[in-house]
Regions:
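ABC ATP-binding cassette signature C-motif
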Residues: 1-262, 309, 316-372
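Intracellular alpha-helical coupling/juxtamembrane segments of multi-pass membrane proteins
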Residues: 250-306
Length: 372
């Protein structure tokens, strides 16, 4: 479907992409990984035609459509939530409008009119095209996707300008999913999702008809979704089979092999340089010295990938507490008529490790503040 061929991109002295070559198939599920600043977003922008490489090519089949979700910065305004989501089907809705207008015109013409059969044929063409879009199911699809991403039925008529930045990104995700491009480019799509919406998105993308290329720091999400992993490191694009866990294992094997090859090459270079230095001025060895110099110049030197800097820290030990740290019994909390917490009972003991989950607005932060 899409071929990346020898992509090169350089910012100043730094290579972002160096001879990057890969392919993306019709149904591929690919995780794009690499350290911050490695070039992941840049590669997505190149695929979305928002940035040009210095050289190389992105070959796409004629039928390919691409949808790109940036990390942030998308603001929708001027429509209700439902209308904004519906705009993903703009071409389909335009066809419906054209058919209605043409049908009205057709009724005003005589059957012997010169334009009658031309318009009739055009309506037939448009109707056949609409059949592929299953227009009757559009309202169901729109509401299904919006509900999956955490919107309530009461949100449908709200103006998009009423939603915060995180919910704006959910609207953008919904529109992309509804538009159903051949390739989805998703840059950190789970950043603004609660765990329930994240699981819904994960399952939706598994069933998605097209290909998906996703950037995420959520290893479990990548493992669950992806069957292939692209890694960008020091400008190189490495391709691995499997999700993130498989990538980690294969990457370690590749790097260990690279280090061994590097050490072996360095020893050979050192031996050659010693020979050259030792016999450089000896006439009987002149031809051998020149031969070694040429061989040294032709060596394609192996480069070792530098390890990412990591930060190590630890919390100072807390004063020893009693066995029961916190105990809540029949705790209630309301904001006006809205009951956020009702009859919550919980005991937290020394050494417990707890996760608090729930939909956005369910009351997680409120409970944490009450406990604090």
């Amino acid at each position: 479907m899409i071929q990346l061929r020898n992509l090169m991109l350089q910012y100043g002295e730094r290579f972002i992409l160096r001879d990057a070559t890969a392919s993306i198939g019709n149904k591929d599920r690919i995780g794009l990984v690499g350290s911050n600043g490695a070039g992941k977003t840049t590669l997505l922008k190149i695929l979305a035609d928002q940035e040009e490489p210095d050289s190389g090519f992105v070959d796409k089949a004629n039928y390919v459509t691409i949808g790109y979700l940036p990390q942030d910065g998308i603001i929708a305004a001027g429509k209700s939530l439902y209308q904004e989501a519906e705009s993903a089907f703009e071409n389909t809705l335009t066809l419906t409008s054209k058919i209605d207008e043409a049908s009205t015109l057709l009724h005003s013409l005589n059957t012997d009119s010169k334009n009658y059969y031309e318009i009739l044929e055009l309506i037939g063409t448009w109707e056949r095209e609409l059949e592929n879009h299953d227009v009757e199911k559009l309202p169901y699809r729109i509401e299904s996707v919006l509900h999956g991403l955490g919107f309530e039925q009461s949100d449908m008529k709200k103006q998009t300008s009423e939603f915060s930045g995180g919910w704006q990104m959910r609207i953008a995700i919904a529109k992309l999913l509804l538009a159903s491009p051949s390739l989805l480019l998703l840059d950190e799509p789970t950043n603004h999702l609660d765990i329930i919406s994240q699981h819904w998105l994960e399952n939706y993308l598994k069933r998605y008809e097209g290909a998906v290329l996703v950037v995420s720091h959520d290893r479990a999400f990548l493992d669950e979704l992806c069957k292939q992993t692209f890694e960008i490191t020091q400008g190189n694009l490495n391709v691995y089979q499997g999700g993130y866990s498989c990538f980690e294992k294969q990457s370690k094997i590749r790097k260990d092999h690279l280090i061994r090859s590097f050490k072996s090459q360095q020893k050979e270079i050192e031996r050659t340089e010693k020979f050259i230095d030792r016999f450089r001025y000896k006439a009987s060895k002149a031809s051998q010295v020149q031969s070694r110099i040429k061989a040294l110049d032709k060596i394609e030197r192996i480069e070792i990938e530098t390890e990412e800097n990591s930060i190590a820290f630890s919390f100072p030990p807390a004063p020893r507490s009693g066995q029961t740290i916190i105990e809540l019994e029949n705790l209630c909390k309301s904001y006006g008529d809205l009951k956020v917490i009702e009859n919550a009972t919980i005991r937290i003991e020394r050494g417990d490790r707890l996760a608090m989950v729930g939909a956005n607005g369910a009351g997680k932060s409120t409970l944490a503040k009450v406990v604090a």
